[in-house]
Design a protein with these regions (language model features):
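Transmembrane alpha-helix interface motif
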Residues: 1-44, 48-57, 144, 148-151, ...
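Membrane-helix interfacial "entry" motifs
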Residues: 14, 37, 60-65, 96, ...
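Alpha-helical transmembrane segments and their helix-start/interface "positive-inside/aromatic belt" motifs
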Residues: 25, 64-74, 245-248
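Transmembrane helix-loop junctions in multipass membrane proteins, especially transporters and channels
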Residues: 41, 45, 60-64, 88-96, ...
Length: 267
């Protein structure tokens, strides 16, 4: 299951989605999330799913690849859906003890599950098509107005980028430690839930040691390359908006407008 966690991975490519300015993709993700929270009908969620499928096709990312990243989140998705299932109003369809299932509760549960799945897949699509360096530059440019109040924008952007990039690294390290302990007789897949949780405790110490070691090595490497954030730092490739970015932003605005219209008319 650890290998199914794909957040933070980057798949190089030359598609139109890969070539978009990272600021455009970040703004697009925000617009997509806003549209998801505006969606209140099956038609709206179908539209948002169609948008995601279209973008993944343009990026040459198979829907199967996007959905594979949801496997580690299945428990959270199901739990959230069940919680929303019992908090609907209206005439109960099924009732037992203090719990009741209504048509509105089923609708809310389906919408919540769809919202989480589409939101996570949209975030995956951003990381799949944007390198950590591009994300750092994009975040720094977007947050640059905060420099007026002496906010450490470059440091924040670098910190977020490194954190995102370290996710697959830590997952790989965890998988190696688990394999080494399994070779010594440890079991992580058998027994009751409490026993499985206890079996994971011995993983924490070597994982933290590995994480701190990697962080120290990264800091040393950055210092050796004379890295410094803030004013005076240059880039090999400066960010520039192109015509395709304008088209993408217009498309984002149209998606929000379409979902807003569907919400207004109850479709």
């Amino acid at each position: 299951m650890l290998k199914d966690i794909t957040l933070g991975q980057y798949f190089p490519g030359s598609t139109i989605i890969h070539r978009l300015d990272p600021r455009t993709k970040l703004i697009g993700l925000v617009c997509y999330i806003v549209a998801l929270f505006l969606a209140k009908s099956y038609v709206s969620y179908a539209l948002m799913a169609l948008v995601l499928i279209t973008l993944s096709a343009l990026a040459h990312i198979r829907p199967k690849t996007l959905l594979s990243g949801l496997k580690p989140l299945i428990f959270i998705v199901i739990f959230t859906g069940i919680i929303n299932l019992f908090y609907g109003t209206g005439e109960p369809l099924v009732q037992f003890w203090i719990f009741k299932i209504t048509a509105n509760g089923i609708r809310n549960a389906v919408f919540m599950v769809l919202r989480i799945m589409l939101l996570v897949c949209g975030t995956f699509l951003l990381t799949y098509t944007t390198s950590p360096l591009q994300l750092t530059d994009g975040l720094e440019k977007l947050f640059s107005p905060l420099k007026a109040i002496r906010f450490p924008v470059p440091e924040l952007a670098m910190m977020m980028s490194i954190a995102l990039r370290f996710i697959p690294t830590l997952i790989e390290e965890t998988d190696k430690i688990m394999s080494a302990q399994k070779a010594r007789g440890a079991s992580f897949d058998t027994g009751k839930l409490k026993e499985r949780a206890k079996a994971l405790v011995p993983l924490l110490v070597p994982l933290f040691v590995s994480a701190f070691r990697r962080a120290d090595e990264l800091a040393t490497a950055m210092e050796c390359r004379c890295y410094h954030a803030g004013e005076g730092r240059t880039r090999m490739k400066e960010l520039h908006f192109a015509a395709r970015d304008a088209v993408a932003l217009v498309f984002c605005a149209l998606v929000i407008a379409a979902v807003s219209v569907l919400r207004h008319y109850g479709l």
